[in-house]
Amino acid sequence: MPRCPAGAMDEGPVDLRTRPKAAGLPGAALPLRKRPLRAPSPEPAAPRGAAGLVVPLDPLRGGCDLPAVPGPPHGLARPEALYYPGALLPLYPTRAMGSPFPLVNLPTPLYPMMCPMEHPLSADIAMATRADEDGDTPLHIAVVQGNLPAVHRLVNLFQQGGRELDIYNNLRQTPLHLAVITTLPSVVRLLVTAGASPMALDRHGQTAAHLACEHRSPTCLRALLDSAAPGTLDLEARNYDGLTALHVAVNTECQETVQLLLERGADIDAVDIKSGRSPLIHAVENNSLSMVQLLLQHGANVNAQMYSGSSALHSASGRGLLPLVRTLVRSGADSSLKNCHNDTPLMVARSRRVIDILRGKATRPASTSQPDPSPDRSANTSPESSSRLSSNGLLSASPSSSPSQSPPRDPPGFPMAPPNFFLPSPSPPAFLPFAGVLRGPGRPVPPSPAPGGS
């Protein structure tokens, strides 16, 4: 009796999403019958011993040395490549076959007890819907291997037997989930057209659209959106983390999937359930300038607030993300918006450059050359500059003078009078109330007498 291969007994359910890949050939960590298809390599000649040529035993054939039955049964293109590379048996046993079925490893005398041989279609349907120790049906395995003819045949068997295509394995994955994870858009289109539900949830509450965005596969997402019947695909469905497919696409920073979701009507301001963050706030917290610009170009609300009242500008200012702060301010972000702690983006900012941008100082372009003074510029003097000039005595102190009027010029040929700040300041008149104000901690100083008095 042949022995089981090493590691075959202690192999548990295979997590195709989180299990690390083996260092060898692709799919080497999977069971033999679930590995992806590859071109068969020529087998080396067996060494000759004292007893002659030694024929190696195949553990999946049960030690039988009979050749496989030639010819594809029921239109299957290449059934021997259905489960692993090399010559295998047909999809279901026949009378001319003397070896066990490759999926269940039952000898031929026991198989007619399960499926009568006079109903080959019933045998096909029974074996196509039978799950192994991992909960995988032959349809799961054919999808993982990317065997499109076998997927066609098995889908037809499911439909003829009245079975649903949404069969979960032990990891709560349907064949459609596996088709999206392995990025096979043709298989995705085939399964959805045949009746697979695009809203089936995996163990994380994710639909096929979530998985397509998570694995950065815009081709699978497009195939899913094109082949789904109207009203059967909800793009606003949340997973167990409260995220929509658009949130997942923004977090993976795949602009093609984001663009595709927005074109198909996904809500650009949808908030997650846990924190109330919009996709724009997620993009800001990921420090993705290109994603922020893409969302703003499609009309995202720049002042959207999460449950704590903070906006995208709060997040960018508190993290010191200078390019994002500048982009949000130019897009109309409100710097006076307060969160639940009564903090504005200016109050949570820690960087001096961010503070300057929020105050409007760093956004003004710096002038490289100073223009020559002209009468027009002197006529448009600001009130602050006119007040500084009047305090220095450069402008007339008469009440009738206004800041918009320039000071009178001296006639030609006469020198300009010296400014007032070169002359001693006159003493205040006696009738002003502040004439006797204290100048120090001592006594009040009496007003000085008027000039010319005794």
From Swiss-Prot:
Record gene name: BCL3
Subunit structure: Component of a complex consisting of the NF-kappa-B p52-p52 homodimer and BCL3. Component of a complex consisting of the NF-kappa-B p50-p50 homodimer and BCL3. Interacts with N4BP2, COPS5 and PIR. Interacts with CYLD.
Keyword Repeat attributed: yes
Native organism: Homo sapiens
GO cellular component: Bcl3-Bcl10 complex; Bcl3/NF-kappaB2 complex; ciliary basal body; cytoplasm; cytosol; intracellular membrane-bounded organelle; midbody; nucleoplasm
Keywords linked to the UniProt accession: Activator, ANK repeat, Chromosomal rearrangement, Cytoplasm, Nucleus, Phosphoprotein, Proto-oncogene, Repeat, Transcription, Transcription regulation, Ubl conjugation
Entry protein name: B-cell lymphoma 3 protein
Biased composition (Polar residues): 365-381
Disease affiliated with this protein: A chromosomal aberration involving BCL3 may be a cause of B-cell chronic lymphocytic leukemia (B-CLL). Translocation t(14;19)(q32;q13.1) with immunoglobulin gene regions.
Its job: Contributes to the regulation of transcriptional activation of NF-kappa-B target genes. In the cytoplasm, inhibits the nuclear translocation of the NF-kappa-B p50 subunit. In the nucleus, acts as transcriptional activator that promotes transcription of NF-kappa-B target genes. Contributes to the regulation of cell proliferation.
Pfam family, one: Ank
